[in-house]
Amino acid sequence: MRCPKCDHNGTRVLDSRPVQDHYSIRRRRECEKCGYRFTTFETVEQTPLIIVKKDGNREEFSREKVLRGIIRACEKRPVTLEQLEGVVTKVEQQLRALAQSEIPSEQVGELVMNELARVDEVAYVRFASVYRQFKDITVFFKELEDLMKQENSTN
């Protein structure tokens, strides 16, 4: 690692510790020549996740886009931003665990709904109503019934 101050190629690591996401390491370094101390981050290189939309178009997975949709579903609900970011992180981890370069958008939506149901049932129903494009009230009621059956079977 080159020193950013004197460009010397020799540095030593003073301290290493994982960053909160556990995919990065923070290192404190010191230049062997000038003694300048600086911080570096080592991060796992992630291959991009490509989402195949319903119309066949492809786009890179966007945490921000998923988070915006979840935030909309959780308006005026007692859910923290930290919880919502946790949902997005879990969804992204599940997508990466699939080890597929291309993933259908339907699969992303299902994963989001599964995680959201664990956080807030009302937000889940809101998200599902937009995602699944309920055409009438009977489909909406069926989704509620399924959710209630699922809840009763876990209790």
From Swiss-Prot:
<dbReference type="Pfam" id="PF03477">
    <property type="entry name" value="ATP-cone"/>
</dbReference>
<comment type="function">
    <text>Negatively regulates transcription of bacterial ribonucleotide reductase nrd genes and operons by binding to NrdR-boxes.</text>
</comment>
<dbReference type="GO" id="GO:0005524">
    <property type="term" value="F:ATP binding"/>
</dbReference>
<keyword id="KW-0804">Transcription</keyword>
<dbReference type="Pfam" id="PF22811">
    <property type="entry name" value="Zn_ribbon_NrdR"/>
</dbReference>
<feature type="domain" description="ATP-cone">
    <location>
        <begin position="49"/>
        <end position="139"/>
    </location>
</feature>
<keyword id="KW-0678">Repressor</keyword>
<keyword id="KW-0805">Transcription regulation</keyword>
<comment type="similarity">
    <text>Belongs to the NrdR family.</text>
</comment>
<protein>
    <recommendedName>
        <fullName>Transcriptional repressor NrdR</fullName>
    </recommendedName>
</protein>
<dbReference type="InterPro" id="IPR005144">
    <property type="entry name" value="ATP-cone_dom"/>
</dbReference>
<keyword id="KW-0862">Zinc</keyword>
<dbReference type="InterPro" id="IPR055173">
    <property type="entry name" value="NrdR-like_N"/>
</dbReference>
<keyword id="KW-0863">Zinc-finger</keyword>
<feature type="zinc finger region">
    <location>
        <begin position="3"/>
        <end position="34"/>
    </location>
</feature>
<dbReference type="GO" id="GO:0008270">
    <property type="term" value="F:zinc ion binding"/>
</dbReference>
<keyword id="KW-0479">Metal-binding</keyword>
<keyword id="KW-0547">Nucleotide-binding</keyword>
<keyword id="KW-0067">ATP-binding</keyword>
<dbReference type="InterPro" id="IPR003796">
    <property type="entry name" value="RNR_NrdR-like"/>
</dbReference>
<keyword id="KW-0238">DNA-binding</keyword>
<dbReference type="GO" id="GO:0045892">
    <property type="term" value="P:negative regulation of DNA-templated transcription"/>
</dbReference>
<dbReference type="GO" id="GO:0003677">
    <property type="term" value="F:DNA binding"/>
</dbReference>
